[in-house]
């Protein structure tokens, strides 16, 4: 089976705004932000280490946050031990070492996605984007999400 990958143009604005008109089908990714996230999860995004090139609007950030939360909740039980979360975050941060993501911030974002109340106000928005993209990719890989499963997850996040 041949894999089809869509390249995401670099240096352009990324938006999470849904286009007008009917959906192309169940599970179909409809936003630039969704396509970028899918490409990042498949290690096919133009900016693999850190924030994507160009402008990122709030709706794109929201799509990535929701997708990250969906993936985190698939990977961890709500009452997962902190040690399990810490080990998984450490592996992910190490895997994407070139992005220099702060481990504690990444761990707090995972814990917040699991419903824990943690202080997020001090986390830099660019760090949040990096965590929502790169550890998301690690979790998608760990869960062995196939192309269809990943597309469904991202499409669900776009609906938010």
Where are the regions that the model predicts?
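Actinobacteria-biased recognition of intrinsically disordered, low-complexity terminal regions
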Residues: 1-31
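Short amphipathic alpha-helical segments and their helix-coil junctions
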Residues: 38-55, 90-91, 108-121
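Alpha-helical rod/repeat scaffolding segments in eukaryotic adaptors/tethers
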Residues: 22, 26, 46-57, 96, ...
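Charge-rich, solvent-exposed alpha-helical interaction surfaces
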Residues: 32, 36-39, 84, 88, ...
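N-terminal interaction modules that seed assembly of large macromolecular complexes
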Residues: 42-78
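Charged low-complexity stretches with an acidic bias
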Residues: 82-109
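Amphipathic alpha-helical binding modules
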Residues: 108-160
